[in-house]
């Protein structure tokens, strides 16, 4: 009896380790790729910003800040942008190229650069901002996305966006 219990326990432990290894290897349990939270800020009287802030990893394992936000101005005009922030000195974004959003089915959208809206003094080469207003409603919340960010050195940065973050962006866009 003692031998059977030990053998059963060993088998269960082995199966558990194998399942955990498979899940970790396939990135299913990787919650660090996108942890986000929705925030509401009043920037000025009558001007409100809704934000989704997340942390993403590129294909090299470098962390990026992703801030999707809707700004509603006092006159009622609204915009919805995505700001991507890399580590200073690691990347120089090519602002002459659009941000490409590609879903796992191969559908691609282009988001135009809107970085001139964020820099008052000096352009930061590791920060880019893109206009998602025209396309955010077209993104499917059940399908993961890959963002492709052009760089000056020609090697694009690829960021994986889980469906939950796409859904959060759409929630923010609908405020």
Residue ranges and their predicted role:
Residues 19-31:
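C-terminal segment of classical bacterial N-terminal signal peptides
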Residues 51, 77-79, 94-96, 142-144, ...:
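Extracytoplasmic
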Residues 37-74:
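Low-complexity, acidic Ser/Thr/Pro/Gly-rich terminal tails and inter-domain linkers that flank the onset
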Residues 92-98, 111-112, 158-160:
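Short, hydrophobic/aromatic beta-strand segments
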Residues 2-18:
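Bacterial N-terminal signal peptides that target proteins for export
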Residues 62-100:
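Short, surface-exposed binding/anchoring microloops in extracellular/periplasmic proteins
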Residues 105-154:
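Short, solvent-exposed, Trp/other aromatic-anchored flexible loops in extracytoplasmic proteins
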């Amino acid at each position: 009896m003692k031998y059977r219990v030990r053998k059963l326990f060993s088998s269960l432990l082995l199966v558990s380790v194998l399942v955990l290894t498979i899940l970790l290897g396939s990135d299913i349990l990787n919650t660090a790729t996108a942890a986000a939270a929705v925030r509401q800020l009043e920037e000025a009287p009558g001007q409100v910003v809704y934000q989704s802030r997340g942390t993403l990893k590129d294909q090299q394992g470098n962390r990026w800040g992703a801030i999707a936000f809707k700004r509603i101005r006092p006159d009622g005009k609204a915009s919805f942008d995505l700001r991507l922030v890399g580590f200073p000195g690691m990347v120089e974004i090519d602002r002459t190229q659009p941000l490409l959003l590609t879903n796992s089915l191969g559908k691609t959208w282009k988001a135009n650069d809107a970085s001139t809206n964020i820099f008052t003094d000096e352009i930061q080469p590791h920060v880019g901002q893109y206009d998602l207003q025209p396309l955010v409603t077209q993104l499917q919340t059940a399908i993961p996305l890959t963002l492709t960010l052009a760089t000056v050195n020609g090697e694009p940065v690829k960021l994986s966006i889980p469906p939950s973050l796409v859904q959060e962006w759409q929630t923010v866009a609908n405020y």
